[in-house]
Amino acid sequence: MKIFDYLDQSNATYSVSEHKPVYSSQGMAAEEHEKGRYVAKPVIVKSQGTHVMCVLAAPHKVAFEKLKDVLGTDDVKLAEEQEIRQVFPDCEEGAEPPFGRLYDLRTIMDKALERDDHIIFQAGTHDKAIHMGMKDYLSLAKPEIADFAYHPERGA
């Protein structure tokens, strides 16, 4: 898988845990005995014909009006599952790691995810999670940071 090759070639510090297969980021948080705010979920959108990876915490949702402002266009919609499978051929559907740059995707991370010292994400499969420090993730993934998510705990 691209993610392990990239992390190993970058001499990244990370750990991998295995768990029963889960099909949601909140499910992974429960399996990993972690708060959902530490679990990064990538959401793939299509904007002006180009795919963009939006990374946010498991309990949060994309606020499309905010995202439209960030992207500078009203042409923003969720990518179709078939498109996502084509972009991430080495990943199980719905288990994409939050490293858009490995797939030539612009990556934008919600600023609320940045507040914590570590991050957990799916490793391309539904039964493995990668744990790493937030500083390492930011250094390797190089996401743009923006406010584009709805945060239920804050009401916005």
What is the predicted role of each segment?
Residues 1-156:
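Extended, low-hydrophobicity, polar/charged segments
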